[in-house]
C-alpha cells in the first residue's frame, strides 16, 4: 500500500504539500520512529525521497536501526547516514536503469535455490571501493543523478535508461550532462543520448506519434534484474492507458526460468519480490496491477509467457517533473486504484477477479460521449423455453438464454461510433461519422465501465430507443456496482472493440475441413480450390496488382519497403523484390498447407439475437435473399458444430436497424440458443462462418448438435476477494499470474491435437471398421467436452485435466511432430500437394542489376566512399548474423540507415532527394 503525507516543514525546498509516496509498511515504521523520538520534527522532503526510492526491505531495516537507537540528534541526519552506509551509486541503478549492477556469487559446483541475505534486498550491494559517501549536504552522487533524471520529460528519461544497456547510471553520465539535454527537441535529444550511451543498443525509430499509444516495456530476468525496452507506438490503446496516461503504465515481461531453477522450493522468489516492492524507473515506482493472457485464440498455441501480458502502474514518484503535475492515483493503494476502474472486489473468487478486471486491457477506441448524459437501462435476458413455456436449465441449474451478450444502443449514439473498427483500430481513415448521413454500424462490440460496473458484449442498433440510451442485459454485466460505494468516483467510459464490418472472403480451417469431410464433402472439392489458388498465387511474380496486394498484406514484415518499390515502378523481376515476393508466396502456401483454403460465397459475420422474435428455430437473417446456409463457429470440434439453417428476410427488422448491415441474426425461439449449439458460442462479439456455397450445401449432411456430457461446474469454496486483506489479495493475484504464465494449462492444446489426430485416422477408415470407428468417435466426443471446458476454466479457476486414455502421442505428418504417421486424409493430401508445388518452385534465380540504374553516371568519389562503407556494413552484419542476439541484425540495419539518412529513415530525413540519390546510386552499383 502506498501512502502520502503532508510535509510539515514548509521551508524545505519550498514544498507545502508533498506527495512523497511510501509503502504502507514503511510509513507505519516511520510513525513508530516519530512516536519514540517524539521531540524531533517530521523528516524533510529529501529524506522521504530517499526512503521512497529504495526497496521496502532496506527502508524498513534503516528505520528499525533508528527506532532502536536510545538517542538521536536529528532524524534526517541519522537516516541519511544509515542510507549512505548501505546504498552505493551502483547499488541503486538496478532500480534506476533497469539492470542489476552485479551478479551475486554462487557456490562453485552448486545450483543455489535460496537467496542469501545479501540477495534479498533489491538495491543492496556487497561492500566495495565503489561506495560514494554523502557530501557535506548529505547528498550522494547517485541522488544528484536521479534528481537530474527526474527533471526530464518521462519519455526522454525512459529513452535514456533504455540506452544504458545494463550499465549503472553513474558510470556513463553526469547530472550536468543530463540537464544539458533537457530542453533539446526529441530528435536531437535521441541523437545526443544515442551517441553518448546507446551505440550497443537497438536504436529507437522516432516516427510520428500523433494519436498513437506509447507502450513502455520492461523485461525481468530470473535473478530479479530488469531492463527497459521501448517505448513502442501502436495505433490501438486500452482503457487503462487512456485513464492513467501512457507513461504511467509499464508492460512487464517476466522471462522463463532456467530448468534447474524449477526444482527449488521457491523458484519465483525474485519475481515475487518484484511484485511486492515494485519496479523503479528513475524516481518513479511502478507496481503490479493487472495481467491478461492471449485470449481464446492464443491459448492453443501458447508455449511461453509472451502471450501473458503483465501491467504495472505508477504508484509514486519523487521526480520534480511529476510533482509539478497532479496524478489521478495520488495517495491511493493498488486496491483502491482498481476500485476506481470497477468494483471488482465484489466478485466471488480471485481467478474471476483478475479475469474480469483484465477487461480494461481490451484494445479499444473510446466513444467520445458524456457518460453522465447517457441513460443506462437494464433489461431482462430472453430465456429459452420448452414446449410448455417453462425455462430450460443448463447442467449447472441456470436458465439457458437466447440473448447472451446482446444489448441495444440508440441511433444517435450509434452514429457517433466510428465505422470499420477492428480490435480498437480504425481500418479506414476518416471514419468518424458525426452527423453524416451514412448508416451507423449495425453491431458494436463494447466494453462499458459505469459507476463501478463492467459490461462486456455487443450493442445492436435500435432505432426505437429514445436518444442517449443504451440497454444492457444481466448476461452482459460482468461486474456489478457495490451499493455501499455510492459516493465513490469511477473512471466511466464507453469503449468500442469492433464494429460489424464489410466481410472479406472467408477461409476454411483444419478443423472445419475435417468436419466438412466427415459430413460428406468430397476430397475433390477441397483439392480443386487448392489447385486453383496455387495457380493464382503464382501471379505475384508478374502481375503488379497481385504483388502489391501481397506486399500490403505483409507490410509489417518490412515496413512496407516492397510495397514502396512496387509503387515506385521497380520491375517485379528486380532480384531483391523477386526474392522478397517469393518469401511472401511461401507464407501464403504455408497457410494453404494448414487448411486455410479461400472459399467462394462464404463470410464471417458477427452474430446477434433477432429483436423481432419472428425467426423460427431453424432460421437466421441478415442475407439479402432466402436460401439455405451453412453456419459454423471456430474453433468448433463437435460433429454437430456445423448447422444447415434457412436464411430468411425479416421485413420488421428494418424498424430496428434501418439499412445497417453486416451481421447475422439468430432466433429467440427454441429450448436452446443456436449460438450455444455451435461450439458453445454466444452473442458478445463472436464471429460466425456463413456459407451459401452451393457445392458445400449439396454435399454436407449435418449431425446432431453438441450437448455437454461433462459434470456440472465445481463451485469455488475458497475465500472471496472481499474477505482477503489487500496484502493477501495481491499475493493471491500474483500467484495466479505465475501459474498462468509459467505453468499454463496444456490441456487446451493437447485436447485439440489429440482430437485432430484421431479424426484424421477416423476419416480414412472404411465402413467395415465399425467397432474401431465407434471407439474413436467416443474419444473425440470426450475430447470435445474437455476442450470446451478448458477454454472457459480461467474465468472460474476450475482445473481441467486430460485423461491418458484419450491422449495421443502419434500424429499425422502434416502436424509436423516428432512421432508421426503418413496421413492419407484430405488434410494430408492438401499438405502434400502444396509441398509438391514448393519443390517445383525451388529453381534459384540469378542476380542482375536493373539496366536503368547501371547506365547512369556515378562519381568516383561516391563510389570509393560507398565501397568502404559497404565493406564495414558486411563485416558488422556477418558478426550480427553469427551472434545469438535476435535483434543484432536489425540494430546494424538501423545504424546504417541513420548514417545514410541522418535520421531513422527516409520519411524522417531532412536531406533532399537530390542529395540522397547520387549516394544511393553509387551504393546500388557497389553491391
UniProtKB/Swiss-Prot annotation:
It catalyses: RNA(n) + a ribonucleoside 5'-triphosphate = RNA(n+1) + diphosphate. Residues 98-135 are annotated as: Disordered. The keyword Transferase applies. One of its GO terms (molecular function) is RNA binding. Its EC number is 2.7.7.48. Keywords: Nucleotidyltransferase, RNA-binding, RNA-directed RNA polymerase, RNA-mediated gene silencing, Transferase. It is an enzyme of class 2 (transferase). GO terms for biological process: regulatory ncRNA-mediated gene silencing. It holds the Pfam family RdRP. It comes from the Eukaryota. Residues 121-135 have a biased composition (Basic and acidic residues). InterPro entries: RNA-dep_RNA_pol_euk-typ (IPR007855). Probably involved in the RNA silencing pathway and required for the generation of small interfering RNAs (siRNAs). Belongs to the RdRP family. PANTHER family: RNA-DEPENDENT RNA POLYMERASE, RNA-DEPENDENT RNA POLYMERASE 3-RELATED. This is Probable RNA-dependent RNA polymerase 4. The gene is RDR4.
